[in-house]
Amino acid sequence: MSQNQQREQLGSRIGFLLLAAGCAIGLGNVWRFPYIAGAYGGALFVFIYIGFLLAVGVPILVMEFSVGRAAQRNLGAALQKLEPKGSRWHTFGPLSLIGSYLLMMFYTTVAGWMLAYCWSMLKGDLSGLTPEQVGGFFGGLISDPTSSCLWMGVAVIFCFTVCGMGLRRGVERVVKFMMVGLFALMIALVVRAVTLPGGEAGISFYLMPDPEKLTGGLWAAVTAAMGQAFFTLGLGVGSMTIFGSYIDKSRSLTGEALYIVLLDTVVALMAGLIIFPACFAFDVDAGSGPGLVFVTLPNVFNSMPGGQLWGMLFFVFMSFAALTTIIAVLENIVAYGIDVLKWTRKKAVTVNFVLVFLLSLPCALGFNVLSGIQPFGPGSMILDLEDFIVSNNLLPLGSMVFL
């Protein structure tokens, strides 16, 4: 069976849309977006961010789709097939693959934290803890090398198992289930958050522009919004190119890109409607960085009636968002082995499982065994370096290749 025939095995257009949206919808929407929006003034940042999505994100997404549909391959093989004779565009293929590996090096660690919190919420480990104890719980998780590597490994094993099941029976079926579950959980969480007493102040902060709330200056907000637009769509490393190979030639690439950007934006905005009303209702800082998800929100859930249930649902939702992105990016990595190196799917999955797990260890160990490595000075971690390389450099620069 040819590779082209294999790609046509996606069961439906909705399968394509949810799969591509699953790649875009991830921690960038529900872990990164709310705390960055909170740090840069709420609504004003949101408007700048949406402007970048429409002006830059959609055109580059269309370009990535067009390369994939024209070649019916992943980015590495597509560039080899489409480049003019004598040119060297194909050299970007391995570079884009490196970008995907770098993204997975820290993404899998954070996904592992989400899974750990799901399990802990289910068992009630965080129920009744004081704010200091909740902070100590997160600190204990990331400072324990065994726990960090174990939960990172669970995320890697699960996602590669899905990829190993094949495109249609594994990737499409699992991601469709997770995406439907993600939207259902999100709606329930939004309804609960916006009905909290005092939550209207958070809604106002989030949706009403106020330049006086803009900390760090307008230029800082603009650059943060641009980086977030590239990060959330996964542009610049070729992850979206492979999904272009699944688009029927009768479909408009711009239309499909707009649908995916719309789904991605809805999730990001709804994540804010979960987090900001909850934070304002319980008088906590909505711009407190990644600790917002792992320390602040568990304290909020502990203050709510039925908080254990809502906390568990929230971290299931977060896990779905993280895992769908990992599965989609890993499918792109696996496809490189199949299309370019002519490996079987089984070999591509096996080799890359070992590689991704080993590459993810520095980040998982960066908060404990390797905590002495502080690339940006005291307090910084290996995760910060990997995030900076990907979000602020590889994604924007890689996107320029498609222009």
Across the structure, where does each feature detected by a protein language model lie?
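Juxtamembrane helix-boundary/capping and inter-helix hinge elements in multi-pass membrane proteins
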Residues: A39-L44, A70-L75, K85-R88, G124, ...
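Membrane-embedded translocation segments of transport machinery
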Residues: S2-Q6, L10, E172, K176-L323, ...
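Membrane-interface "cap" regions at the ends of multi-pass membrane proteins
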Residues: M1-W31, I60-F65, R69-P94, K213, ...
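Inter-helical loop and helix-membrane interface segments of multi-pass membrane transporters/permeases
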Residues: N4-E8, I36-Y40, A70-L95, T108-R168, ...
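Extracellular loop-to-transmembrane helix junctions
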Residues: E8, A37-M63, S147-S148, L395
